[in-house]
Curated annotation (Swiss-Prot):
Cellular component terms per the entry's GO annotation: extracellular region
The protein's assembly and partners: Heterohexamer of one A chain and of five B chains.
Name listed for the protein in its UniProt record: Heat-labile enterotoxin IIA, B chain
Signal peptide boundaries: 1-19
Alphabetic keyword roster: Disulfide bond, Enterotoxin, Signal, Toxin, Virulence
A GO term for molecular function: toxin activity
Disulfide pattern: 33-104
Gene3D superfamilies xrefs: 2.40.50.50
The protein's role, per its UniProt record: The biological activity of the toxin is produced by the A chain, which activates intracellular adenyl cyclase.
Amino acid sequence: MSSKKIIGAFVLMTGILSGQVYAGVSEHFRNICNQTTADIVAGVQLKKYIADVNTNTRGIYVVSNTGGVWYIPGGRDYPDNFLSGEIRKTAMAAILSDTKVNLCAKTSSSPNHIWAMELDRES
């Protein structure tokens, strides 16, 4: 069994057992994002994960299948932050398992800055 299938099965089982993976944007996620100045971007299929250690760049980026680019805090801004590390892990799991995500992202920055991410297995 390929590692991609194993990770996909793991993500799916974790979602089923924990009840934390929703079809569409969950009410809890919507409430969290509504408390910020960010906007919800639903049903994003991430395809690329870019980690750049160049001192002139921000560090971690994800790219969707439609070409959208988002920045994950980390690298230069919060290198040891546990929560931004969890967003990076969620992004990698979504890419490896072909699972869509819902993003809470600040659209006034370029690239858009991700503040929260939710796996969305049935979008």
